[in-house]
């Protein structure tokens, strides 16, 4: 895919800064007025006007830097809408919110989704196995991600992507990192425009259709729910028709998911995670090491020494990994009756982190791993699996030799006279 010149989020932020100034505060106290819902959300006539100015400045900049006719952009965004609902959905949960791993897992690793996944695998086995051959990502993991994301296209979102991104780019909820998040979504809006321009080939109808495609409340699109920037960087033309279509082409979706994981460090033939030994003796160490940071800080050898892992998990020939392989402690809490969370701990490996890069959530990554296992994925080193195959083959060969030897040594009785 040919990339057009891009403008960085920082540059956009600086260029738009002139439009974000606010009026000086009044010298006298304002009259007490009833606060509307719009004002609570920061959406007043003044802020709406400022957001519109910022949006118009952005599309002018994108037009100039990428050679896209401004008329194309004005036509494509003429009917855009501000989505207050999206702001509510993307806002962080209240501080009293309790994470619930068991409930989260049950939404994905469940019979209906598994049945749909098995059908998807059967219908797309050739593409899945080809993607695995090229990238080293097991086909069950690829299928699990698409199943978790959209149930293979059944749930690709209920919002128009241009409305989502234009809302969050200029009116993100009031959070400490609001400015950084708005810059991120302005970059995604810019990437969407460039993506649709490349797809449209100067056809306004195609451009508009691309802008209007369904998305999640965060602006992710297609069967694998890629953000526009990820489509530009990681998506693949899996069916070879010269077009990347994550909405309608299953092969494109399959190869794109596999390529994303490969680029983000997937290690072919290696496991995703290990179960831990959670006892009264090891529990304090698990709590200490589970810092919530998606960084591989410890070696498997260290975790074995801490008593957190079984010794065989540091042995490639026993289904484990190299002792010096890096890992992290993953905490998966669920509420309990006594208000104290019950926490399940696993050890995440490099492949776990690759999935976290797809969606920055431990719950998500572990759900994908367990979903893939439900589809037949063997969460152990391929060296162990190959050793098992070789052993079975060797046992079979030895058995045949033994049978042949017995036949050879068997005395033939003379026929009766």
Regions found by a protein language model. Give the residues of each.
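Short glycine-rich loop/turn motifs that provide flexible caps or phosphate-binding loops at active sites
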Residues: 8, 146, 152, 218-221
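Bacterial N-terminal signal peptides
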Residues: 7-17
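DNA breakage-rejoining catalytic core of tyrosine-based enzymes
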Residues: 184
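Amphipathic alpha-helical interface segments
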Residues: 216-222, 227-230
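Cell-wall glycan-active module
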Residues: 1, 17-179, 188, 195-210, ...
């Amino acid at each position: 895919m040919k990339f057009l010149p891009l403008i960085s989020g920082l540059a956009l932020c600086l260029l738009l800064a002139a439009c974000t100034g606010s009026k000086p505060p009044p010298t006298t106290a304002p009259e007490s007025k009833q606060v509307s819902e719009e004002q609570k959300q920061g959406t007043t006539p003044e802020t709406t006007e400022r957001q519109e100015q910022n949006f118009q400045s952005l599309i002018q900049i994108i037009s100039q830097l990428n050679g896209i006719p401004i008329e194309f952009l004005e036509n494509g965004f003429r009917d855009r809408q501000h989505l207050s609902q999206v702001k509510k959905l993307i806002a962080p949960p209240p501080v009293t919110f309790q994470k619930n791993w068991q409930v989260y897992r049950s939404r994905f690793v469940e019979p209906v989704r598994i049945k749909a996944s098995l059908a998807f695998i059967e219908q797309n086995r050739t593409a899945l196995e080809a993607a695995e051959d090229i990238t080293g990502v097991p086909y069950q993991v690829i299928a699990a991600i698409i199943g978790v994301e959209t149930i293979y296209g059944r749930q690709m979102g209920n919002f128009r992507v241009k409305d989502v991104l234009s809302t969050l780019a200029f009116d993100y909820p009031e959070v400490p990192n609001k400015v950084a998040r708005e810059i991120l979504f302005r970059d995604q809006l810019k990437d969407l425009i460039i993506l649709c321009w490349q797809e449209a080939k100067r056809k306004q109808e195609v451009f508009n259709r691309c802008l209007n495609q369904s998305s999640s409340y965060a602006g992710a699109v297609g069967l694998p729910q890629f953000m526009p920037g990820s489509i530009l960087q990681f998506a693949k033309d899996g069916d070879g028709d010269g077009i990347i279509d994550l909405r309608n082409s299953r092969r494109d979706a399959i190869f794109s998911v596999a390529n994303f994981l490969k680029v983000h460090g997937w290690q072919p033939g290696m496991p995703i995670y290990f179960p831990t030994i959670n006892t009264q003796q090891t529990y304090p160490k698990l709590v200490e090491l589970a810092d919530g940071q998606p960084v591989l800080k410890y070696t498997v050898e260290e975790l074995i020494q801490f008593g957190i892992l079984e010794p065989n998990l540091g042995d490639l020939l026993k289904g484990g990994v190299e002792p010096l392989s890096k890992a992290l402690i993953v905490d998966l809490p669920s509420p309990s009756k006594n208000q104290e969370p019950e926490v399940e701990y696993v050890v995440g490996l490099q492949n776990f982190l690759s999935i976290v890069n797809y969606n920055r959530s431990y719950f998500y990554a572990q759900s994908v791993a367990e979903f893939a296992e439900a589809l037949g994925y063997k969460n152990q080193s391929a060296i162990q699996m190959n050793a098992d195959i070789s052993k079975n083959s060797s046992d079979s060969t030895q058995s045949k030799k033994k049978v042949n030897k017995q036949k050879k040594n068997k005395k033939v009785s003379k026929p009766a006279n």
